[in-house]
Amino acid sequence: MRDDPVSFGLPEDETGDILAMVNLGDIMEVFTENSTFKMVSPDTLDPDRKHQETPWIYTKTSHFGASNELVANTILLANEFLEQLFSIDSPKRLVIIQKVRDIRNVLLEYLCSLISFTEKLKEEIDKYDFNKNEMNGRAHAYFPQIKNIDGIATELLITAKRCIQEISVLVNCFITLKAKHGRIDKLLSEIESEHDNANELIEVLRNNLAMCEYIFSLRNSQEHAATTDKPLIVKNFNIENGLDLSLPKWGIKNDALNFIHIQANEILNFLITFFEEVFLACIILTLPNFPVYKIYFNDAPKKEKPIRYCLNLSIPDTFYERSSQS
């Protein structure tokens, strides 16, 4: 029956322990070290309670679990902080964690595109290395090329830009703003004029503005390539210096070109860190005067759940001494 006690077990082909559960309102996400599951209650499936036999259902939604740094330092980090500051039924907690879930999903989309690209890159390099000693006249028997490389660049840059926009909108979940801003410079301008007490958030946005604008410029130069004097240049495998194999690169015309796989990975790391910094700066704005909380950097995160920051109650020494003596 739907109202009977329920226990959640992993499918037979899954191993490991449940390391975290995140309440997202209509669903619950369950995390093992290497997987994420979505669990849906009977009340979500049958809100009018017309069918007493409606079951709980769960499905595997991702092969990335709590041990993935992206997962750990987005939704799991946010959940641990929010659980300490808000009740489980708090509407504000729900709005924030759902937005963080959206950001996590965009980042996972980016990560999957990057993994797919790097796997294709390795496959082409391996084929080239295997065949490079075989020549047909002066031509290589096999020369590597990434199919649809412009489409891959589009996937990466659209997703990176969308992630920045989602992080920008996350701020609206914490403080009142006149609009939802898709650009960090616009967000920063309003916060500086309307929320000058948000010192940490202002500093975070200022420090990350240049990189956000650079990512936007890469995407915009590609999107408007036909109408701009500085389009995005995307180069496939090439031969440089007469005989050196050059890996795929991208860059804005007349600027230096960068290896796609290296810069795309740098962008991913930036986006995760940018989320962390914006989220923590917003959390600071919501901390009560009492009890006193402090945010700590975890310099030895656990392998199975490598969350980099934690929120702890700051207990005065006098209180601790008095408690230990009683």
Question: Where in the sequence are the language-model features?
Answer:
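Short E/K-rich amphipathic alpha-helical oligomerization segments
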Residues: 126-136
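Extended, well-ordered alpha-helical segments in internal regulatory regions
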Residues: 157-175
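Hydrophobic faces of stable alpha-helices that mediate helix-helix packing
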Residues: 111, 118, 160-164
